[in-house]
Every structure is written in C-alpha cells, then in structure tokens.
C-alpha cells in the first residue's frame, strides 16, 4: 500500500495505478481524432467580418485593427497568421471546487500564442480534461491576439527592436514594467515575460516586476497587458491627423446585404 500511495496522489495518472497509461492514452487519442476532423472541416464564417475575410475583401489584420473591429472567430487569425503562429503552454494547474459530493477537480491551462513578428495573444481556459482545456485556451488566445508596436532605443537605424516607450501592465498584485533597451541587450526578464516578449517579436527590453510574481497566471496577464499598451500611447509621431475612410462594413454593405447560403445537415 505504501508503494502505491504516490501513484494515487498524482492527478496526471488517472484514478489509481490501473488508470495510468490507459486513461491518458484514450484521452490523447480522442483529442487527436477531434483535431483532425476540425482541421479538415471547411470554414463557414458566421459573422460579417468573417465573410469579408473569406472573400478577400479585407487584406490584413492591420486593417481590422485600424477600425477596431471585434474578432469573434478564431479562424480569422488562422486565415492571416496560420503558418507563422506558434503556441506554447505556459502552465497547467489543477483547481478544485467544494461540492456536496466532494471536491470537483478541473484543469486550468495558460497558453501564449504569437508569430514573433508583432502579434501576441494569451488564453486561459478551465476544463475537466487537460486536452480540452489546452484546446480551448488556444482558441481564446487567438481571439485575444493584439498588435505589438515596436520602436528604437536611440537612433532610428535598422528595424524596430524594442518597445517604443516605458509601458506598465498590472493584474492582481503583479505589476510589470517594460523599458526600452539598446540593440544587442536581449530580453532581461524572468522566464515568463521573456517567452511572451519573444513571441511578440521584441528583441531587446529591460523589465521590472513587483508583487506576487510566483503566481504565473497574473504574471503572464500583466506582461500581456503591458505589451498591449504599446499602441495606447500617443507619441509625437502619431500626432498628425490621418483621415479614416469608411469602415469595411460600410464599404462592402452591398456584399453583406446578400443572403448567405445556409448549410443543411446530412441525414
């Protein structure tokens, strides 16, 4: 009995020593089969923005961000950044809720996604199964993809390599401050912000963190909030007024007014 205690205490091996390899294998197989069906399924947009993207009316993500159009379908991100997107699971942690029948355990997944070239997203999902939590977190991360503004530390020579100014993000007690750094410095930070900054395409940056940085979820969310603020500051080079044209919804109103063909489920 003493030898079996460690196997029963872990949550990754199923219930008891019998559910170790078999339970995980079945779960992984179901997830793999499900992903294959989703990948082979053709995308049928359900929003106006999705229809415009599918028909090629909108050429890039920046055009969507320019008019602050909300993205409700993760396939839009796949359409523009599918081949360059990389996702990484930051952490999977068990969370419990006390019920009448006892404790209900679920798994919480933190996933970061980016293309190493100016786009970053962060997703958090809780589910009964690890595979379902990761899959849901990836979808939420794609829906939360934001543009990253990069700048220079000194002279504007070469490509932008660091954050344009000092920015701060906060979540819970954790506060993260990003500071521009000279070219060649690298990313001076803890492992969690370093992953997010690298996936965002920032090459050089100093960081300063305060609070309970051991709480990985809040640490990642604070870093994501700081990166997202790079486009929130109105620097002098953005003072010039740029007249905006009509939104894509207005420009292609005739196309959007046409009825969409409905799908009929096969009997």
UniProtKB/Swiss-Prot annotation:
Belongs to the universal ribosomal protein uS5 family. Residues 11-20 have a biased composition (Gly residues). The lineage of its organism: Eukaryota, Metazoa, Ecdysozoa, Arthropoda, Hexapoda. This is Small ribosomal subunit protein uS5. The keyword Ribosomal protein applies. Residues 21-34 have a biased composition (Basic residues). The modification Phosphoserine is found at residue 60. Residues 85-148 form the S5 DRBM domain.
């Amino acid at each position: 009995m003493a030898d079996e205690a460690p196997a029963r205490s872990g949550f990754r091996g199923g219930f008891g020593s019998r559910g170790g390899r078999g339970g995980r294998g079945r779960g992984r197989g179901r997830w793999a089969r499900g992903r294959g069906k989703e990948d082979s399924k053709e995308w049928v947009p359900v929003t106006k923005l999705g229809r415009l993207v599918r028909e090629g009316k909108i050429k890039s993500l920046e055009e969507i961000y320019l008019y602050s159009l909300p993205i409700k379908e993760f396939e839009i991100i796949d359409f523009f950044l599918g081949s360059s997107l990389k996702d990484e699971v930051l952490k999977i942690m068990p969370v419990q809720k006390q019920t009448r029948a006892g404790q209900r355990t679920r798994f919480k997944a933190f996933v970061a996604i980016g293309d190493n070239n100016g786009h970053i997203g962060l997703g958090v999902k809780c589910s009964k199964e690890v595979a379902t939590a990761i899959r849901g977190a990836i979808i939420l991360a794609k829906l939360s993809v934001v543009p990253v503004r990069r700048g220079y530390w000194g002279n504007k020579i070469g490509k932008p390599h660091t954050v344009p100014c000092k920015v701060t993000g906060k979540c819970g007690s954790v506060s993260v401050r990003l500071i521009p750094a000279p070219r060649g410095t690298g990313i001076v930070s803890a492992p969690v912000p370093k992953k997010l900054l690298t996936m965002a395409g920032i090459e050089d940056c100093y960081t300063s963190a305060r609070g309970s940085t051991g709480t990985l979820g809040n640490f990642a969310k604070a870093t994501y909030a700081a990166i997202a603020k790079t486009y929130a500051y109105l620097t002098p080079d953005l003072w010039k007024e740029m007249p905006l044209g009509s939104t894509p919804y207005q420009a292609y109103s005739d196309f959007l007014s046409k009825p969409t063909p409905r799908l009929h489920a096969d009997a």
